């Protein structure tokens, strides 16, 4: 049984044109980690700290479903563009070697099918499921951009060394990317006009076309001591903290009107937001 406790506080960031309408703590009978929201924000996927198993939570009905119990099933699952299906990888050991397959689960009827049989080849589920995406290449020294199936390779920063966390905006007008040594940037899809946004911005994701939601972390050289959800306005470059020091956030996901984040100890929160453009 799922219980939702709401804490509405009407917190407004006028300069960033983003309003936090309410925050809801979603209390589950188990821990929740590594959340992923569906495109329309009605379903959130979650897993265990080690990515074993994958479950879905319907935010309207509070229903939790088991999608898969396999090893690695919770690592970067991908929704279809209509939000009706989820594709994910599971890991098995064959003759002492690790192999991964790709499965597809239908959220409406519960049907599950294997798309790719176990293989040792590297499989990118983003490229398999969607025709529009941005992803760092295997060597992390460039980014592949696919717009409606047309793929180009870009290197947005002349002295960039390693790229991580790249994603095309919802309207397909821009992309963000993180250069591991310097931080988060936003640019045109061809990599031009790269603009610096933040030094520490982990797990970034789009909230509409004007904001990037990310995790700002601090550490003492050994462990994370602070991890806050931040909202970054890509036009003004203003950064607003959305959570406090008492909440050690470990994972997040967002849409244009919702942010879901999980804490280090497995608590899940739903933050309803309003963006005025």
Regions of interest found by a model, annotated:
Residues 1-10:
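Bacterial N-terminal signal peptides
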């Amino acid at each position: 049984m799922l219980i939702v406790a709401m804490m509405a506080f009407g917190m407004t960031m006028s300069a960033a044109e983003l309003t936090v309408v309410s925050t809801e703590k979603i209390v589950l009978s188990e821990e929740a980690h590594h959340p992923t929201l569906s495109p329309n924000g009605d379903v959130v996927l979650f897993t265990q700290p080690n990515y074993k198993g994958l479950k879905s939570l319907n935010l309207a009905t509070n229903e939790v479903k088991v999608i898969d119990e396999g090893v690695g099933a919770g690592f970067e699952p991908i929704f279809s563009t209509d939000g009706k299906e989820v594709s994910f990888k599971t890991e098995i050991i064959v003759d002492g070697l690790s192999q991964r397959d790709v499965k597809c689960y239908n959220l409406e009827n519960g049907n599950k099918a294997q798309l790719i049989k176990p293989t040792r080849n590297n499989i990118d589920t983003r490229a398999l499921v969607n025709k529009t995406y941005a992803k760092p290449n295997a060597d992390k020294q460039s980014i592949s951009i696919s717009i409606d199936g047309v793929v180009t390779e870009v290197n947005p920063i002349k002295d960039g060394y390693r790229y991580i966390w790249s994603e095309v905006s919802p309207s397909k007008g821009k992309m963000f990317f993180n250069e591991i040594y310097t931080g988060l940037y936003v640019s045109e899809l061809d990599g031009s006009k790269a603009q610096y946004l933040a030094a520490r911005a982990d797990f970034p994701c789009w909230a509409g076309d004007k904001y990037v939601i990310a995790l700002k972390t601090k550490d003492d050289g050994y462990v994370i001591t602070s991890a806050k959800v931040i909202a970054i306005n890509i036009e003004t470059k203003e950064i607003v903290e959305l959570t406090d020091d008492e909440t050690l956030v470990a994972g997040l996901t967002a849409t244009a009107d919702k942010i879901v984040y999980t804490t280090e100890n497995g608590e899940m929160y739903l933050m309803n937001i309003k963006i005025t453009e």
